């Protein structure tokens, strides 16, 4: 039994740990993809000028699903309110951005007063995505984030930044307005002093809007990852060492939201 994390298990729900009635979860909601792309063809890739994008079969393509599993309860009843609230939240954010307003000012609306149920449900949606990204990387289940995602606690540990996706902007300057969606995978920043993970971080982009979301760790969390989940820690540490040897450019960091 872990203190802050539970070991990764392939055939277990990445939110509650159950092994029953396992289903899949979209990296980007199928309804959001349908709204953005309609019936137009979709291509999957890094769009970095190096790799070649490939054709996606449609919004329900397996390419848009996490390999990590989620039980039917967590994928339904326990997270449904957060899913629906994110839809409403994103519609408002997109509207604010379209009007030239700061998208983060959506939190000035009365329904998103800090600590309100609507406010918490927005952050629960991002907590769910972050837990899925950790499981996708065979990482241990972050218990506090998981409990928050499924509504077992009201303590919000998720940080959020909203901006315009730089990849979308780059293509807009070349091609004009276009259809675009993306996710940022999992980024695990390291603390240079402790040499342990300091955060889990990811992002999702829907059209021009990018949401960057993360959790921060106290030192004890990094220690537990290293001591009790060494294989995952070692994979993260190898990526950290590679980043030290080959630092990202300012443009790459901006593109990743770092």
Question: How would you label these PLM feature ranges?
Answer:
Residues 1-81:
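An N-terminal structural lobe/cap that precedes and organizes the functional/catalytic core
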Residues 14-16, 109-113, 189-191, 198-200:
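Intrinsically disordered, low-complexity boundary segments flanking structured domains
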Residues 47-57, 102-109, 190-193:
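Low-complexity, polar-biased intrinsically disordered regions enriched in Pro/Ser/Thr/Gly
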Residues 135-258:
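C-terminal, charged low-complexity interaction regions
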């Amino acid at each position: 039994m872990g203190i802050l994390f539970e070991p990764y298990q392939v055939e277990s729900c990445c939110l509650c740990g159950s092994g029953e009635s396992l289903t899949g979860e979209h990296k980007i909601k199928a309804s959001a993809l349908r709204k953005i792309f309609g019936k137009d063809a979709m291509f999957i890739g890094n769009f970095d000028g190096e790799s070649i994008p490939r054709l996606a079969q449609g919004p329900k393509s397996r390419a848009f699903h996490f390999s990590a599993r989620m039980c039917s309860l967590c994928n339904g009843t326990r997270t449904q309110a957060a899913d629906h609230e994110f839809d409403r939240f994103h519609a408002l954010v997109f509207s604010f951005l379209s009007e030239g307003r700061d998208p983060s000012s959506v939190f000035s609306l009365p329904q998103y007063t800090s600590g309100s149920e609507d406010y918490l449900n927005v952050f629960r949606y991002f907590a769910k995505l972050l837990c899925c990204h950790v499981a996708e990387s065979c990482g241990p289940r972050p218990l506090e984030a998981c409990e928050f995602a499924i509504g077992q606690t009201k303590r919000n540990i998720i940080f959020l930044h909203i901006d315009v996706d730089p990849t979308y902007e780059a293509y807009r300057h070349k091609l004009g307005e276009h259809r675009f969606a993306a996710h940022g995978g999992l980024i695990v920043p390291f603390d240079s002093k402790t040499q342990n993970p300091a955060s889990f971080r990811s992002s999702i982009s829907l059209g021009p809007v990018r949401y960057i979301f993360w959790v921060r760790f106290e030192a004890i969390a990094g220690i537990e990852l290293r001591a009790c989940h060494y294989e995952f820690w070692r994979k993260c540490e190898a990526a950290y060492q590679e980043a030290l040897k080959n630092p990202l450019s300012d443009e790459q960091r901006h593109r990743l939201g770092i």
